C-alpha cells in the first residue's frame, strides 16, 4: 500500500531569495517520484531469528528492508515472512532490544531465505562501537560513513572524509589541513576515538589535523552533541569513533591493496592490509596495515598554490586472542606526515599582509606557474605513536570486566620561513600521554535494567622547550611546558523494552594542569602555576518506537569541559595558523546544556530523518580575531607580521537542524537530499559568532547496474554565504556562496574494485568561510581521482 505524505501545517523553511526557486524546483522533482508505480513485485523472503550463543529462537525481532515499507516482526517460533517484494538488490536489517542489529545485502529474484543469529548487545546507547552501519540503539543524533560512500572517499584525510555527513563540516587551513566540525564545534570539543582510545595530540589547534590514517579503520561513526560519558564529559561537540573490523579467527590469510591517484596535486596513495590467524592455534588473529601518500602543490581553478604538498608514511600492527571466557588484543600504530603550509600566509610586514588580503588573487610570488612537488618551509612535521593493550573477562554472574591501557607520543615541529638566514623560527610540541580505563559491565543489574560503571585516568606531559617538562629553557615559546592529570568516574544504566529504551548516565571529572616556565631564557629558576578544575556531566536519553516505520528519540545532557593549555597560556606566533595567539590564565570551565530530538520515518520507499538540537554553553571559550573600530590589529615580530587572535569567554547558543531524505525510485535508482543548518549566537554581547559553518545543502542521485556492482552517481553541493557575521568582526567579509558538482562511478570485476571520482567537476573558483586561508587564496579546483583495489 502506498502512503501519501502531506505537508504539515505550520512548517516553513525560510530561504534567501536567490536560492528559493532552486530549492522549490528541486523539491518538486524530488517529491514527484513518489507516484511511480510498482509492478512485478511477487518475491517472498523468509527466515528465522535466533541467538548466536545458544541458538534459541527470538520472537519479536524487527526485520525490515531499508528504503521500503516492507517490515515485519518474528513470530513465537522466531520466523519472519516478507511478501510482495520487487526483484532486486536490497539491504535487509534485523534488530532486537539488547542485541546488536545486523545488516546484510540480498539479491532477490523469486523466493529467498535469510536467517539471523543475534549477539548480545554489549555496548550501550552513548558509547556504541562503530560497526560501519546505522546504529539503531543510540539516543544521540548520529551519522555513519560506510560502504560505498566511505569507499569513494578513500585517500582523503579524516576531516575531508567526514565532510558531507549531515551536521558535520570541515575546518580547513589551506588545502592540506582539515579537521571535523560537528554542529559548529571542533578541536578540543570533539573527541576522536581511535581503536577505542582517545586520540591525544595537539588537537586544540585549528590547523592541527587528526594524526590518524583512516585506512586503519573500516568503520566510522559520528555521535553529534554531548554524549559518550564513558569517554569524557568534554565532548561538547560530539565524538568521532573509528574501529577496525574484528581480527580473523581462521588461519587463512586475506588482504587488500589500494592504489589511488588524485590529479590535483598529482597525489599518489598506496595502502595495503594483510591479516590472518595462526595455524593450529585457535583464537589467535593478526593484522598488518600500512599507507604511503605523496603529493605536490595544489591547484585552484586558476593558479597553483606554492608549498602545499603533503607526504605520509603510516603503519599499524594488531594481535589478538579470544576464548569463551576472555579475550585480549595488542595494537600499535605510527603516523608520520610532512605538510606544506601555503607561503602566502606568512608575510613580512603589515602593508604586504593587508594588500594580500585585499587582492582577489595572491601575489605572483605565491602562485608558481608550474607544478612543484618539493615541500619547503613553512611546514609541519608530525609523528604520532599509539600503543594499546585491551583485555576482556566474562564473570560468572554474566557481567564482564574490561581493562584498557594506552601510551601515545605526539611530536610536532612547525617550521616557519627562514628570515635573515636565521633558523630560530621553529615551534616544537612534544606531548606524551598515558591513559587507561577499567570498566565493569553488568549484563543484568536486575530483570529490567542493565548498566556499567568504571573510571578513566589520563596523565600528560607537554614539552615545548628543554629536555623534560619540569626543566624548560625558553620563555619565547607559544606555550609553556605543562603537565596534566585527569581522573573521571562514570556510571550508566539502561532499560529497554520492545517499544522504548531509556538510558541515564552521570560522570565526574577532576583535572589538574601545572605550568613550568623559566624566569628568563635558560634560567635555573622555574616559575610554576597550578590550576584545578572539576565538574559533573550527565545525560538522559529516551527512544520510542511508534510503529514499524517510525521511531523518535530525545536526549537532555549536561557537559563540562575544563580549559586547555593553549586557551590558558598561549602567547606567541602560531606558525601553522599564521597568527599571533594570546591566551587567558583566568578562564573558567565550560558547561553545556544540550537538548536534541530526532525522528526517523520510513514510509513506502522513503527514508526520512530529521534532527533538531539546541546547545547552550556557559563560559564558552573561543579564538576571536582582534578588531578595534573596524580595523584589524596585527603583531609585528622578528618572524614577520601576523593577525592577532585572543581567547575570550562568553555565553553561547548553538541551534540547528540536520535533515536527510532519500527515495528509492526503483531498486536501482535512488535520490537523496541532505541539509545542515547551524546558528550560533553570543548571548552575552547580543551578537553573532564568527567562524560558524554556513548553510549546506546536497542533492544526490545514484543508479546501480545489474552486473558487477557497477554504479554511477552525481551530486550538487550548495554552500550559502555566511551572512550572520557582525560587521567589522573579521579581517575580511565572508566569501560568496558557491555550488560544486561531484561525480562518481565504480565497478567490481572479480577481485578488483575500480572507481572514479570527480570533485568540483566544473572547476569552480570559490572560497569557503571555514578555511582560515580564505583571506589569501581560493580553494581547490577540479580533482579527478581513480582507485583500484585488489582484495584476496
Which sequence ranges carry the predicted segments?
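Bacterial Sec-dependent N-terminal signal peptides
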Residues: 1-48, 63, 90, 792
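Periplasm-facing N-terminal accessory domains of Gram-negative outer-membrane beta-barrel systems
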Residues: 37-126, 183
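Conserved aromatic beta-strand anchor motif in extracellular beta-sandwich/beta-rich domains
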Residues: 65, 192-194
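Short, well-structured beta-strand/strand-turn elements
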Residues: 72, 166-176
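Acidic-histidine catalytic/liganding microenvironments
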Residues: 82, 165, 666
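Outer-membrane beta-barrel proteins, especially TonB-dependent receptors
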Residues: 122, 127-153, 172-180, 184-185, ...
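Active-site-adjacent helical/loop segments in soluble small-molecule enzymes
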Residues: 162
